[in-house]
Amino acid sequence: VAPPQHLCGSHLVDALYLVCGDRGFFYNPKGIVEQCCHRPCNIFDLQNYCN
C-alpha cells in the first residue's frame, strides 16, 4: 500500500479515477480536499468517495 500523500486539484481527481475505476465517484470538494489535500490521505480514504 502506498504511503499517505497530499493530493490536490487534478492529482486528486486522477487518483479518484484510478482508485474507483468503473464505479465512478462523487466529488465533494470540501470533504475530500480537507482530507486529502490539506492533510495526507491513503487509498482507503479515497475509496470512501467511490460510488
UniProtKB/Swiss-Prot annotation:
Subcellular locations according to the entry: Secreted
GO MF, one annotated term: hormone activity
UniProt entry keywords in alphabetical sequence: Carbohydrate metabolism, Disulfide bond, Glucose metabolism, Hormone, Secreted
Cysteines paired by S-S bonds: C8-C37, C20-C50, C36-C41
Domain of life: Eukaryota
Keyword Secreted: yes
Primary residence: secreted
GO biological process, alphabetically ordered: glucose metabolic process
GO CC entries: extracellular space
Keyword Secreted included in the entry's annotation: yes
SMART domains membership: IlGF
Coiled-coil intervals, chain numbering: none
Record-stated family: Belongs to the insulin family.
Function: Insulin decreases blood glucose concentration. It increases cell permeability to monosaccharides, amino acids and fatty acids. It accelerates glycolysis, the pentose phosphate cycle, and glycogen synthesis in liver.
Subunit details: Heterodimer of a B chain and an A chain linked by two disulfide bonds.
Protein name, per record: Insulin
